[in-house]
Amino acid sequence: MNSLFASTARGLEELLKTELENLGAVECQVVQGGVHFKGDTRLVYQSLMWSRLASRIMLPLGECKVYSDLDLYLGVQAINWTEMFNPGATFAVHFSGLNDTIRNSQYGAMKVKDAIVDAFTRKNLPRPNVDRDAPDIRVNVWLHKETASIALDLSGDGLHLRGYRDRAGIAPIKETLAAAIVMRSGWQPGTPLLDPMCGSGTLLIEAAMLATDRAPGLHRGRWGFSGWTQHDEAIWQEVKAEAQTRARKGLAEYSSHFYGSDSDARVIQRARTNARLAGIGELITFEVKDVAQLTNPLPKGPYGTVLSNPPYGERLDSEPALIALHSLLGRIMKNQFGGWNLSLFSASPDLLSCLQLRADKQYKAKNGPLDCVQKNYHVAESTPDSKPAMAAEDYANRLRKNLKKFEKWARQEGIECYRLYDADLPEYNVAVDRYADWVVVQEYAPPKTIDAHKARQRLFDIIAATISVLGIAPNKLVLKTRERQKGKNQYQKLGEKGEFLEVTEYNAHLWVNLTDYLDTGLFLDHRIARRMLGQMSKGKDFLNLFSYTGSATVHAGLGGARSTTTVDMSRTYLEWAERNLRLNGLTGRAHRLIQADCLAWLREANEQFDLIFIDPPTFSNSKRMEDAFDVQRDHLVLMKDLKRLLRAGGTIMFSNNKRGFRMDLDGLAKLGLKAQEITQKTLSQDFARNRQIHNCWLITAA
């Protein structure tokens, strides 16, 4: 009896143990990452030929304690290598693990290699050559703490390499894991199997090989036992011949069918090639088709299983499309696949919850470094009057109502950017803004008392409903999380895409950036204030302080201002403002852009202006500003400096976003100024519910 070890992916150990026992293995013992077992020579070859789950089959040769590199050398040399392989064979060493002595795996591999070579040369035998790419013998050494385990890798290449997939192709899951996913899916051979996101077809090919009794090792060309002196070629040929007979019989007798589709024509072509090389190409129909086009290939029966490994994202900006994808798949399953089973393998349980289905079973497994889950569902048969419920239905209804109200209004006003929803329902705490054919969803960060998983799931429901109600492509939705911003954090950079979208606002053309910053470059609540500035600016010298991207300057310029001066501390936003001005034909000396600390510039400037717009931050303590600024505390000082620059008969439009702001009217009067609040006049329909989003004043000489 041979003592052997089969390695596998984490989470598949018990499944592998059952498989090995079915092959005839005895004394199976599960450990993390594999199974120890025993068997005769025939079982050695059968496990290599038939195991769908094992990554490698190892023949343990011994262990040694490693307190120095000499201990490792002597421990390896103690094995009778000349009985393991002939000097004419090539070999390679795979070394894993480190300790205080062996701190580099390459160094460990070199010491093992030296010990094996010296074992031959000391017996005056020819020195065996190292071949890292295609060796006849692979030696595996695993160092754990002070113990090195030495084994012969009888697999050669990993057993996931079945021989049907081009090694250059990218596979999101290995064939061994794919086989486990098939086994755990609840699918029964003889019933239909469909993968709507099949990629290169690995799940379907593994299922078809399982269903037709085709051994996973049948198409492999190289094995790790070819240079092993104890290799029994006669028994191996018997095992191989039996596998070939069973494969022919299984294929001839199999009557059901497999269906695969993917939106990428290139991977579908690769899938067809892989299936043909695996010997089961005639059983699988592959189509180039998006999930949105998915239909039941057997509407009259029999029932089958939908099995897939859908994509998942690690970045926030990829989630809207994936949320929409999973929500869509859930709706299609309910509408078209009643009575079928569904099994999905994913690294994102949150995305799976977008299906709006209840899982019957779930399994955990590792896909490389990723913790993954496989969930199995049974889709209830639909009745004629059954109607699938939409996620976040209350939110969807409100958004639909708002869309009907605002879409026509915006078209009549001549604006492309407006707010569709602003936390209208407390439990759906987001803002939804439309920018032409794009949508930005801003999630207001939930309080810490709210369960994070529930909050994330609600956000996913909101995104799915938004895409459905507005009928937009998922890649046209941008998701952001918004917290209360202070000072410089309000302009925090989020990305580096540099993608700008041209939008119209009345007669102005403006650039917005929906992804790189928390704000987009256009404050929608100030839309009417900007229009008023345009109407007030004809023939006047206009000053825009804390200008941001200069959209107010654009309106003033288009309104006929004699000159415009735009001041902001940020070079990025001034360059943006320059682009906005250029887009509207506002160039030349009449339109100045100044990079400066606005408060310092205001104190030192000695020019005169007819119309001044200032929209300062509520609070700022930027390192580049000389002093901390508080709009409630400091607005009179601000007005005193502004008055000095205001030409006789001129007007200041002053706006800020501080809730509960109180204008010091008595203090203004002492400065010889008076204020008229125009907040309500500057709030458009889409911000009517949020009357404290800003306050706005016209200030003139008393």
From Swiss-Prot:
Domain THUMP, chain residue ranges per copy: 43-154
Sample GO molecular function, one term: 23S rRNA (guanine(2445)-N(2))-methyltransferase activity
Top enzyme category: transferase
Predominant localisation class: cytoplasm
PROSITE patterns to which the protein is assigned, alphabetical: THUMP (PS51165), UPF0020 (PS01261)
Entry-linked CDD domains: AdoMet_MTases, THUMP_AdoMetMT
Keyword Lipid biosynthesis: no
Record's subcellular location: Cytoplasm
Keywords: Cytoplasm, Methyltransferase, RNA-binding, rRNA processing, S-adenosyl-L-methionine, Transferase
One Pfam family, short name: THUMP
CC terms in the record's Gene Ontology section: cytoplasm
EC number: 2.1.1.173, 2.1.1.264
InterPro entries assigned: 23SrRNA_methyltr_KL, DNA_methylase_N6_adenine_CS, RlmKL-like_Mtase, RlmKL-like_Mtase_CS, RlmL_1st, SAM-dep_methyl-trfase, SAM-dependent_MTases_sf, THUMP_dom
Reaction(s) catalysed (UniProt annotation): guanosine(2445) in 23S rRNA + S-adenosyl-L-methionine = N(2)-methylguanosine(2445) in 23S rRNA + S-adenosyl-L-homocysteine + H(+); guanosine(2069) in 23S rRNA + S-adenosyl-L-methionine = N(2)-methylguanosine(2069) in 23S rRNA + S-adenosyl-L-homocysteine + H(+)
Family matches, as SUPFAM superfamilies: S-adenosyl-L-methionine-dependent methyltransferases
Family: Belongs to the methyltransferase superfamily. RlmKL family.
HAMAP family according to UniProt: 23SrRNA_methyltr_KL
Biological function: Specifically methylates the guanine in position 2445 (m2G2445) and the guanine in position 2069 (m7G2069) of 23S rRNA.
Name this polypeptide is given: Ribosomal RNA large subunit methyltransferase K/L
UniProt organism field: Escherichia coli O6:K15:H31 (strain 536 / UPEC)
Gene that this sequence comes from: rlmL
